[in-house]
Amino acid sequence: MSDRRFGASYSDCGLYRYSLWRDWSGGDGTILWIMLNPSRADHLGNNDPTIERCERRSVAWGFRRMEVVNLFALRSPYPKALREADDPIGPLNDAGIAGSAAQASMILCAWGAHGTLRGRAGEVRTLLADKPLHCLGTTLAGEPTHPLYLPYGRVPVPYGRE
């Protein structure tokens, strides 16, 4: 990808990443990925495996920009940390999610099975009640699947609000 730009928004203390974005020439619109929690991808353009797959999909689907927000803004590659932390959500996370959603051409939910932790998936669905949501499929429990191990042939479908 030529002309690739990147960045992220962090809390002052560095414990939370509120958003991550990648921008490239070509395409149109912004896809917003809502996942579980930030791992190792950063503002310098370094991708972890999940962000790499999201970026490839976003380009293939014709978007010009992708942004990633998370149910939990706490930076950790381990979902277990979300259960143990006093505040895994982060004080500015809901405002960040709502602001990013307001600018998105498509919102793709992809937090996987752990999204039900602390009732967080339901809170975010309520926060975005007026927005059309999409996913790449759902788990047996009805949560949107995480994109890491899904085939690239999967395309976004409407995500219900059951």
What are these regions (language model features)?
Residues 1-48:
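Active-site and ligand/interface coordination hotspots across diverse enzymes
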Residues 38-40, 73, 114:
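Short, glycine/serine-rich, charged loops/turns that create anion-binding
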Residues 43-46, 78-85:
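Membrane-helix interface/capping segments
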Residues 46, 50, 119-121:
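Residues at alpha-helix caps and immediate loop-helix transition turns in enzyme cores, especially N-
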Residues 49-59:
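Short catalytic helix/loop segments, enriched in acidic residues and glycine
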Residues 64-80:
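Short connector loops at secondary-structure junctions
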Residues 82-162:
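Glycine/proline-rich loop-helix segments at beta-alpha junctions forming the active-site rim
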